[in-house]
A protein has these predicted regions:
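Short, exposed beta-strand "edge-strand" segments with a Pro/Gly-rich flavor and a Y/T-containing core
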Residues: 62-67, 97-102, 169-178
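Soluble catalytic domains of enzymes that build or remodel membrane lipids, polysaccharides, and related
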Residues: 82, 90-117
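Terminal helices and disordered tails flanking the catalytic cores of nucleotide-processing hydrolases
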Residues: 1, 34, 88-92, 115-194
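Hydrophobic faces of stable alpha-helices that mediate helix-helix packing
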Residues: 51, 104-105, 132
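Conserved, well-folded catalytic cores of nucleic-acid-processing
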Residues: 61-64, 84, 100-101, 114, ...
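Alpha-helical scaffolds flanking conserved acidic
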Residues: 67-78, 106-110, 123-128
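Hydrophobic alpha-helical scaffolding
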Residues: 44-47, 97, 101, 121, ...
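Acidic/His-rich, divalent-metal-binding segments that scaffold phosphate/diphosphate chemistry
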Residues: 1-92, 96, 188
């Protein structure tokens, strides 16, 4: 469906059926009583709240970018799910949990790609979750440590984008410079109401 959005403008019946099936699975995974989500909530209220924030902002960004809102929302919600296992490599643990709970490949890929430790983001939604997590986490850290004063939202977001782009973070995502600029603008203007 990423190819469809970027190139053809219309979905074939097969692509539409696949998209509908994916969204059906994602809707179930996003249910408040989904077993793995309950495990996350029981494990750590702080991690649960963080994940809910990343989920909400990622969904808004995906809507702004014309991406799959449910995929970005689920990706944000489960991006650090592996932490509930206590494993030192929470990404591998998260991928394993995703497979145990029969997550769609697209969602498992976001868990694997959200921090660049294993893979670079290969979709718009994975890039969104990565940037949302980085921006929200950095902003929270600066606020808690008393270092936020004097750091404008624009400076924070631009610095994170510049740092990530200099490391080739989006080189496999298929995003154009125009899309990258639009995503950066979302975080500055819409998310932070800058």
């Amino acid at each position: 469906y990423v190819f469809y959005r970027q190139h053809s403008g219309k979905m074939t019946e097969t692509e539409l059926a696949k998209q509908q099936e994916l969204n059906k699975k994602l809707s179930l995974i996003l249910e408040a009583d989904f077993g793995l989500l309950l495990r996350l909530q029981e494990f750590s209220g702080q991690l649960f709240i963080h994940s809910m924030t990343i989920s909400s902002v990622s969904a808004q960004a995906a809507r702004h970018m014309g991406g799959n809102v449910l995929l970005a929302q689920a990706g944000g919600l489960y991006h650090e799910i592996g932490r509930i296992t206590g494993a030192s490599n929470y990404i591998d643990a998260g991928v394993k949990l995703a497979e145990e709970y029969d997550f769609p490949k697209e969602l498992t890929d976001i868990i694997r790609q959200h921090s660049m430790r294993h893979e670079k983001p290969k979709s718009l939604e994975a890039a969104i979750v990565l940037f949302t997590d980085c921006i929200v986490s950095t902003n929270e850290y600066l606020e808690k440590s008393g270092q936020k004063e004097g750091v404008s939202t624009q400076k924070l977001v631009e610095g994170i984008f510049q740092n990530r782009l200099s490391k080739g973070t989006l080189s496999e995502s298929g995003l154009s410079q125009q899309q990258i600029d639009k995503l950066q603008h979302f975080y500055i203007k819409q998310y932070f109401n800058g």
